[in-house]
């Protein structure tokens, strides 16, 4: 089994030796057994706290295997709107519910949820249920390196991307 333990920013002269297609729920995990698109088995053993993005490159410790991550199409709700104020209102209401959100010019996307779809329609937006890669914003607690301090002592763990199961 190939163990992918490093993120590679520049492949240099190395050739990509495979791809792995993962949905967002898999791309938030730092430890995961996966099947590459060509059928080979691999394991992710990555630094915690980072969402894998479509297009990222992963390598084994020796650098002999270079694997490109692909974001799998999945059930999402997509809002397209030319009115920036209305789109900002939608983002506000979704953020208020801690919904992981992909934000692009004129577009919001989140894991499909008919209740949230209805809420947005109530604001006057058009919502489409579709299959598309989902690339949510990293969020306040996902950055590299993950370093911050507090003036008081207490034990806690910050999530980096919370992706609730929507039905």
From Swiss-Prot:
One of its GO terms (cellular component) is cytoplasm. Residues 137-158 are annotated as: Disordered. Pfam families: UreE_C (PF05194), UreE_N (PF02814). The keyword Acyltransferase does not apply. The keyword Ribonucleoprotein does not apply. InterPro entries: UreE, UreE_C_dom, UreE_N, UreE_N_sf. Keywords: Chaperone, Cytoplasm, Nickel, Nickel insertion. It is found in: Cytoplasm. One of its GO terms (biological process) is protein-containing complex assembly. GO terms for molecular function: nickel cation binding; unfolded protein binding. Its main location: cytoplasm. Belongs to the UreE family. Involved in urease metallocenter assembly. Binds nickel. Probably functions as a nickel donor during metallocenter assembly. This is Urease accessory protein UreE. It comes from Pseudomonas putida (strain ATCC 47054 / DSM 6125 / CFBP 8728 / NCIMB 11950 / KT2440).
């Amino acid at each position: 089994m190939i163990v992918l333990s490093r993120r590679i920013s520049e492949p240099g002269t190395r050739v990509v030796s495979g791809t792995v297609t993962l949905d967002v729920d898999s791309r938030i995990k730092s430890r995961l057994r996966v099947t590459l698109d060509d059928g080979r088995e691999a394991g992710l053993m990555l630094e915690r706290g980072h969402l894998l993005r479509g297009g990222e490159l992963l390598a084994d410790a020796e650098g002999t295997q270079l694997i490109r991550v692909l974001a799998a199409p999945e059930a999402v709700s997509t809002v397209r709107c030319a009115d920036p104020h209305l789109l900002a209102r939608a983002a506000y209401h979704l953020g208020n519910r801690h919904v992981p959100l992909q934000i692009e010019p004129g577009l919001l996307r989140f894991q499909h949820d008919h209740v949230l779809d209805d809420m947005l329609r109530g604001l006057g937006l058009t919502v489409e249920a579709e299959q598309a890669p989902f690339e949510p914003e990293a969020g306040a607690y996902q950055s590299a390196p993950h370093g911050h301090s507090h003036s008081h002592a207490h034990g806690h763990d910050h999530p980096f991307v919370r992706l609730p199961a929507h039905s």
